[in-house]
């Protein structure tokens, strides 16, 4: 696969994942403005950190992806769904880590774009 096709896959999956995260945000956070509240509540119940809770939830999605591979599933839509879930748990975990560390990731972005990614894509076009 050449770089152009690979970059298309990246954009495709990031778009799908972003749409799911935004749609499910309201479902999981409800009226609470804290998007990560479910992980924090589970942490309170289990005595684990919110990050460890997210990682434990992610394990279910890793198993699901392994199951697809073991069964030889070729349905692209099913792969998109399962890999998207896994990617989203990586993003949710990163959000928890950013919050725990008091990071300001908004300062690292420019108008919603990640400079490193934008630069890499621009360099690929040269």
Report the location of each language-model feature.
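Intrinsically disordered, low-complexity regulatory regions
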Residues: 1-126
